[in-house]
Amino acid sequence: IREQVMGQLRRRGAVVGLSGGIDSSVVSALCVRALGADRVHGLFMPEHHTSEDALRLGSKLAQTLGISTTLEDIAPVLHGLGCYRRQDDAVRTAVPDFGPGWKCKLVLPSILESNRLNVTQLTVQAPSGQTQTVRLSSTAYLQMVAATNFKQRVRKMTEYYHADRLNYAVAGTPNLLEYDQGFFVKQGDGAADFKPIAHLYKTQVYQLAEYLGVPEEIRQRAPTTDTFSMPQTQEEFYFAL
């Protein structure tokens, strides 16, 4: 990391987007080990669907590591781009009643629970708490994914703004499994100046987290996409059989 950032890239430090998850936590801890806490800057980039745990655990990590942070609310930018409107329009093609107070997520059921072709489905939750799962048309599904991809791309744009103003490099947080299976957004979380854990499987990332002293609450947290208004695991969205 030190050779890449200071030698090859000629930058003074590293910027890391903090999600409260295991990957960004390990990358932050590695950067602190390599560059020093005073040369690592963490970014919180919440929007309307960001969980409270993401900010709380990200703040806990930053305090543990002793790094500086900046909070950037990206919701206004996403509103301007039509992210939420485009997503809701796609949902309403399958659930016309979807509106304020409703929540949703995309899920990929386990093939072990079905005797038919496994396709991504939409789960919605009404304000009453009642849930239903329905099929989306391919057009609506692609529009929903395209709309939510705004989030990763706006976050990366924000990371590069802070990297440029500080003369820092942007640290990527995807692990080997995500890169191998294509679980990242082009020019979003897949973009970075250097990628410290891109050669490590998730199990190795967890082992490294314990060695580096990442808070146990973060290590015990189930991996989540933190993309939709309903809680969603990575297995539900992408890694299901």
Language-model segment annotations:
Residues 172-241:
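Mid-to-C-terminal catalytic subdomains of enzymes
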Residues 1-174:
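ATP-dependent adenylation/nucleotidyltransferase module used to activate substrates
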